Amino acid sequence: ERANHLETLYIPFVDIEGEQSGAVEDDTEKPQITAYEVWKRGRAAGLVDTDTARAAFFTQNFADDYTLQLAPELYVKVDAASCRVKETEKIGVGGLTEQIVAVTVTGEGEILSGTVSASEKEQLLNTRMEDYLNAIAAHALEKEIDITNSYRNLGADNRTWYFKYQNTPAAYEKDIKIQYLVKINWKSE
């Protein structure tokens, strides 16, 4: 446990789902991952949905590929992705300094279903993916969960932030904002 005390861990929550096929009830039950228990600083921090956990795995480069729904009929898959996390500051509203955890996503992508015009494919898909990931990250931060797991690397990545937050990791999760920049090369059909 001590080795993971700075990590944000996602533990699968498995539930047994009954299945029905046609008019006859099938008595087979199938285990399914329905959520993930978040474990941080040695304590349970609550449940998150599977989309949030998958986004965290992807952001931390633990997923070989990532399939997601960007619109009602638009499914995409990203392969060979790399997510680079960098802590930075910018002047925000009212001249206040905002602490930004910027995530740059690169890789190859393809449309699994749905259509997008060739002229707007690259920009539209990247923007939709940014919006999707930014929404998930913002929702997780409302629960004080950093899906980038960036706190664990502050000592090496940003010494100023490290000294500021070394004894107050909960304040770090309240103060940061996560922003994604997606630069996926989308394959042509």
Give the role of each language-model region.
Residues E1-E189:
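Membrane-proximal alpha-helical signals and transmembrane carboxylates
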